[in-house]
Amino acid sequence: MNYLKDLKEQFTFDQLLLIFTCFSFTFPFYILGPILLIEFIYLLVSKKAIIALKQTPQIKFLYLFVLISLSISIIHKNILGALATLGIFIVIILMVYYRKHINQSTFEFIIDMLIVLSILWAIYGIYEQFQIYHRLGVDHFTFKVYARRENRLNSVFYNANYYAMMIEFIAVCTVYKFFTVKNNLKISIFYVIVGFLNLFMLYMTGCRAG
């Protein structure tokens, strides 16, 4: 509880909402989607999104893109295309709004949070891989990677390619943190270990990038 209290004192409500949004990207898409939609509705109802859009230069090009893309999808009865357009619009609105509220401390906190979370993803992913080996009757220490979707490592993301994408993002974050840490050998070693752990997990996902 004290930790949550410290967070409330350190960050504003909008910054905490941004942190939670970044945290929610670790959820499966069917949980992430409703969360982003609820945040989008909140920003519209509170008029915070409208104010942010008015203060954003060249925003008319975003409206034009959404209008053209949505019109083409509707004309061709492409429901998925229309939903994808709306999804992109919602994400851009959130980015435009939160750009006003992010600062260095918020950015650093989000990066560290995701790096720590990646360790938990890896632990669960290794457990999941052992379960796959057990189901297939394979020795647990063969480190064999399979191509079939049902035999690929997903961790908490329910999709191997999405997990691989998140690992690649975490790799960039660890490199950034490694080069920005000054005079702290233990922290530097920590980032190196986490980096190699995630590269190993990237290989185990079976993604081409691995």
Feature annotation, model-predicted:
Residues M1-L80, I90-V116, K177-V192:
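Transmembrane signal-anchor hairpin modules in multi-pass inner-membrane enzymes, especially those
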Residues N2, V96, N151, L197-N198:
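Positions in alpha-helical segments
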Residues Q10-F11, T85, Y146:
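Helix-boundary and loop/linker segments of multi-pass membrane transporters
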Residues I19, E108-F141, S155-G210:
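Alpha-helical transmembrane segments of multi-pass inner-membrane proteins
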Residues A84-G87, N154-Y158:
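Alpha-helical membrane-interface segments at transmembrane helix boundaries
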Residues F141-R152:
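Luminal/periplasmic active-site loops of membrane-embedded glycosylation enzymes
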